[in-house]
Amino acid sequence: MKKTIIAASLTALAMGPAFAAINPHNEAMGKETTYDEKSDNQKGKLTGGWYYQEENVQENTDLNHGSVSTNITLTGGSFDELIGGNHIKQPTYKEGTHNVTIGDTKVTMTGGSVEYFIGGSKANNSDKTTLITGDVTAVISGGSIGNQSSTSEYPVSAIGGSYVKSTGNPGEGTPASTTAETGNISLSISGGTFYGAVFGGSVADNYGSTEGQKPILKNISGISELKIQGGKFESSKFGVFGGSAAIGMKSATTSSGSSVSINNTSETLIDIVGRVVGGDLLTYGGSGENATSSKINGSTSVSITGSGEIKTSESVIGGSLLNLLEKDEESSSTISGTSEIVIDAANAVLGDEVIGGSYVRTQKDTGDASASVKGTSVTIKAGTINGNVVGGGKVNGKHGTVESSVDGDTVISIFGGTVNGAVIGGGHAKIGDGTSGDMSADVTGTSRIQITGGTVNGVIGGGLSYAYGTNGADWKSTASVGKSEVIITGGTIEAVNYVATGPKQTLPVAIVGGGVSWSKDTISGDNPPIELTTTTSSSSVVIDGATVKDDIVGGGYAYQTGSTASVENASLSISNATLGSDSNKVNVYAGGFASDNAKSSSVESAQLQITATSVSGSVYTGGSGTNSTVGTSSAALTDVTISEALDLSGATETAVVFTGVNSVGSVTGTAQSYT
């Protein structure tokens, strides 16, 4: 279903010939002005600059106000739109171009209600138009923003920057070529109720479903910042975005960077129903030349801090969100810098996963999509996360060739807090629902995980490739990293708990040095085939002083049908650790693990070192499972107690070095070298 109701969600639909009268409005024309319940034209539009519509735009109309800055405030009353800059709508004069300019804009809202808050300027079905706005300062401390009765699939309430819209649907507007150029944007929110998505940047919206040469809508802006210190946010589909939006066919956005900061030091809950996204939104596009696109020539970030209560219902995303919904829809996003997430709020409860890179979601009949970022960083100091933590990007695909890549390194640093899902150093590629496609979430550099405190439910050093539902046709999922490094010097590591929709999903392992390939038990054998792959050139795990409550695997982990995990060189070092609990023993595997009809888990070279540690289960110098292979293995044990077996089988060649006082329950297999 095309977004035929989206137009109603963003602005009024009345724009055809039958509605030629100028809309009720108040235009400040650069004069510092305060509006309230006593102001004229209640339910109309408010502009800090000039208002241009239809017949009042002629060949000689002066649209250039670049030397004029604006400053308007709304304290009460009920209006349609509050616009900091200029507004131009469906001009009658169509022979020439329209360069609509304004200087810096400032717009403040302390009370009252509007359906749409726009910090910059707006163009509505205005062809051959360039909308130029200086820097934007937008402040909201109270009031109601958005349409409470909207039935839109994604209502929008507040836009920090500028807004351009058009449709190609016959009789509904003018197919327009419009570009908005906006400077740096700051949107600060300390109160108010928002019945729709909030964007720190600008929005380009083609709300029609008709393909054609036009509309062509573009937003170009500087750095956008969304700062939240209070408020209630009711956008169940989307949420809050530091960046901009490209919505509909041939919509595009370009910026210099974006960020979201949520800081609550009050006693009032900040409740966000929806996602928190540092970058842009891309959705409802077309295919080929009709695809949506986003280019961020800089970095993106999300920070969640403060002593007060903060609640989110959906995922927190450091990069951009590509949400493909239409048949054959395609989309692309690039971030030339890094994406960063910092969570340091003891009273924050995040309802879903944390994704360091960009997130790409597709449906059964959508097309290809790609997202990339140069590097990512996720830091968790305090708070509760009721989902997985992904260092790289994520793909949840059902069709097409879909990728979310990190063209550099990823870093996850956990100093405290609770993660009720798995911590995944690389990317997460997910495919399912009996569809077909090729999904990938790769990291070209090194994925790093550093844990000094807190509690997490599983650690995966590399990426996670995952399939669910029933078999598809020729479907592939890949989550690979160049190298993986895990350093754990404190905290508690429980077994892997993969948080997703449906029944609880766990693996009997706490730490995996490489990647994990995992298909649900609803996936059958080779009819049709499925390929789930993770690769790592080298994996390194160092555990010193932590508490680990389930098995430890130095290599990769392949679980169930179609799964492959490969690591060239796996290194595992354990010292002064507490392994196991009263109810569970812990086994240690130098190599990889393959189980339940997995294709293979392979390690070319494995190194294991255990010092001053008691192992409640067994130690395997090779791997585990019929399809698990290890080339060469070396193990060094110093002052180690192994309650059960020391298993020296599972590798082509094994060397063992004993130092100090060691104790084992039994020995299985034979090493080629003992010292």
What is each model feature region?
Residues 21-81, 86-116, 121-157, 161-197, ...:
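Surface-exposed loop/turn motifs in large extracellular/passenger domains
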Residues 1-20:
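Gram-negative bacterial Sec-dependent N-terminal signal peptides
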